[in-house]
Amino acid sequence: VYKKEVLYYYLSREGSITHSSDFSRNYDDRTRSVDEVLEFFHEKGLDQIYRDELEYLVFENAYFVPSKEIVLNDRKSIYLDKFREYSLEKYPDLENNRYISELSGKDKILWALLRRKMYAVMVLMSQLRQIRDRVTGR
């Protein structure tokens, strides 16, 4: 469900892992966090019950989102491959997760470009969106 109204505000701090260009730290923090969640579900015997959801959690938090951030900062970073390898090691069929079909239109396009390693097109799309936002005052 998508709503246009703002339901919460959050504070984005300088140096947080969500905006850090220190990809080594970002990789370590994200993979450690995901490992802890996966371990919790495994210990509780819930990892197979929630397999699709956990697989999507890995896709979103340890592959798709960090890869988009890395592409915009350093398309040649080794961490693009490291995040991909980590995620596919956890869930080899991750790219066929049923929840991926529920991505927004923009993210479906970015996902298709990321899978094909068309990083320059991803950067161009981001730059065009920034220009549009400046022109329209968004």
What do these predicted regions represent?
Residues Y2-S33, I70-D74:
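Nucleotide-sugar-dependent glycosyltransferase catalytic core
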Residues V6, L54, I100:
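Residue-level "edge-of-site" marker
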Residues S21-R25, E53, R115:
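Short, solvent-exposed segments of well-ordered alpha helices
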Residues T31-E53, E89-N97:
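C-terminal, non-catalytic tails of nucleotide-sugar-dependent glycosyltransferases
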Residues F41-G45, K68-N73:
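Secondary-structure edge/capping motif, primarily at the C-terminal ends of alpha-helices
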Residues Y50-Y56, L80-D81:
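Short, charged, amphipathic alpha-helical segments
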Residues E53-K68:
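Amphipathic alpha-helical repeat scaffolds of TPR domains
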Residues V71-R138:
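Membrane-interface aromatic/basic loop that binds lipid-linked glycans or pyrophosphate carriers
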